[in-house]
Amino acid sequence: ILQAASQLLCQKTFAAMTMDDVADAVGIAKASLYKHFSSKDDLCCAAVVQMLSQVRAYLETLEPEAAPLEKLRAVVRWSLQRLLAQEIPEWPGSHSPLRTMLREHHDCLIEWLPVSQCLEQWIAQAQQQGALDAALPPRVVLHILYARACDPAAGFLQDAGLYDNAEIVELVLRTSFDGLAARASAAEL
């Protein structure tokens, strides 16, 4: 049920998804679905909690000795790969009822907090090492990385068909971590 809800969140968004859609995707009666989840809100929150637990599990697979910047890049890479495979949805916009609901849902906050703390720790370490701009507040960097991990631009690039998914991931990583400014060529150095 949660997998179907996640897929539908990716394909249709929260506003367009219905409990009928989920019941049809799972192959059960709508009444049976309501035995598990009392509302679409509860179902979608449970799907997001499951996704966040997958993120936490992924964080635990990263080598503790790896450089903090490399761990941050790995998390964004992993998230973008999941986004392009429609395994995780784009993050809802600021006016989305889903975003408001997720911010108020206890289980979402319980899953979200350790992820944010881990990423903020890596951000602070990367700043101390000079790998990230230390003038930027860590919370700003955190939210920029969250935005990149659920960036609709990746989907736009995918829809255009000019790049394969691996190229899109690398392009988003490059613009996110290296910026848009022109680089000095080897001849200029």
Indicate residue ranges for each PLM-predicted region.
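Alpha-helical structural segments
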Residues: Q3-Q7, Q11, D24-A25, D42-L62, ...
